[in-house]
Amino acid sequence: MRSHRLRLPCAIILAAMALTVPGWGSLPAPARAADAPLTLALTPSRDPAALQEAGDAFVRTITRLSGVPMRAQVASDYAGVVEALRSRRVDLAFVHPVGYVLANREAGCRILVRDVWGGKTAYTARFYVRKDRGLQRLEDLRGKTVAFVDPASSSGYIYPMVLLMKQGLVRERDPKTFFKDALFAGTHEAALQAVLHGRVDAAASFDKAPELHLKDPALIAQIGFVGETPEIPEAGICVRPGVPDETVAKLKRALLSIKAPRHAALLKQIYDIDGFVEADDRDYQPVRDAMQLMNLNPPK
């Protein structure tokens, strides 16, 4: 999957919890001219200069198609995206599934469009294992070791843990009630490499992670999986409250018209996606439910 979904640091959860604490994120929205360009925030995922260049090309296309002046801005970190939307320092943002739930809850944002990647608007998470270890079912992982990605990663922790909890394999949200040991690898690639090199018995990651991160067919052939989650809605673009409905409609029409093959190079540059489809807040209710089960909803 393109990298604005790959890893969502736990800091974004903590930052969202802190938004209502005096002194945290309490700066007023900056004054802006009526004709000032809208700002699209890009979630940090790779070299900032390269991402900024891709973002600039992307918003030029949006402006041309919609007539709405736009600019792109690479966020310093994931937590900063939610806070920038809340304080109206940015107007739209690429967001992860968990990031959207937080932006909706903390900033009142609404989802505008949903990404299409590999022809799909959803993905799954899996527990990957080496095929030569004789592990066939989730139950076979009892007493084994596992690599997760990050405590706030949808496919690298939250959804895999919910799968284990719903099957009665994990108790009290503690992976060590089922696994001998559990670690956070930090990235999806690192989690897969830990399996390949025998440092752990299993790794949690998204459905296309081996093809995206291992690349070598010989390595991919060594990896199988023993459990798969329900679908997770794709990432997308959200818009903050206060952007006029007429403007939002123009932007949505423009975004839905950006698709392959005409815009294939542009879409690959920005986040390696195929285009966008209609989205609805209800699409992300399963993410809210999973976060609730994992006790990751910040208090009101």
Question: What does each of the following model-derived ranges do?
Answer:
Residues 79-93, 106-107, 139, 183-204:
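Short helices/loops that flank or line small-molecule/ion binding pockets
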Residues 83-140, 151:
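Acidic, polar ligand-binding/catalytic clefts
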Residues 72-83, 172-193, 231-233:
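Short helix-initiation/N-cap motifs at beta->coil->alpha
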